[in-house]
Amino acid sequence: MMRSTILAFLVTASAALAGCVVATAPARPAEQHAMRNGFVYLGERFVNGSADHDVLPVGRADGKFHELMVVVERAPVEIFDMVVTFGNGERFEPRTRLVFGRDSTSRNIDLPGGARVIRRVDFRYGNLVAGAQAKVELWGR
């Protein structure tokens, strides 16, 4: 009796674990471009309307960076402003009023002063297609 109970438990547990297998999605072309060029992923935000503002915290644990790249996925978006706040509180506002197509990247954005800790990046942007939700990713190297 005990043996059949254990066997039933093992079969049930195996079936449950088999359902927990997670498949990862392959990187999109824009992400592949960033990774091929030595950039590391810093975070992402979703654009939730025609006008949106988001803060992407980065922090000392992520390292020091001398360049940034913006990757846009899923839908076109317009970035009105981007403000980089460094670890020492200094701010940098690269010229970024750009329209991004779906699955595209920005140019490499050189940061002033060499490799630096980034505290946060503020984005002000808007979707270009009603009802679409663009994903904006930040990459650094």
Regions found by a protein language model. Give the residues of each.
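Noncatalytic modules at the cell exterior or secretory-pathway interfaces
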Residues: 63-70, 112-130
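Bacterial Sec signal peptide processing site at the extreme N-terminus
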Residues: 16-36
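Local beta-strand/beta-hairpin segments that build beta-sheet-rich folds
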Residues: 34-45
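Short, surface-exposed binding/anchoring microloops in extracellular/periplasmic proteins
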Residues: 47-79
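Solvent-exposed serine/threonine-rich low-complexity stretches and specific carbohydrate-binding patches
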Residues: 43-45, 94-101
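Bacterial N-terminal signal peptides that target proteins for export
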Residues: 1-13
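Short, surface-exposed beta-strand/strand-loop-strand elements in extracellular ectodomains
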Residues: 73-96, 132-141
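Exposed aromatic-hydrophobic patches
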Residues: 54-59, 105-112
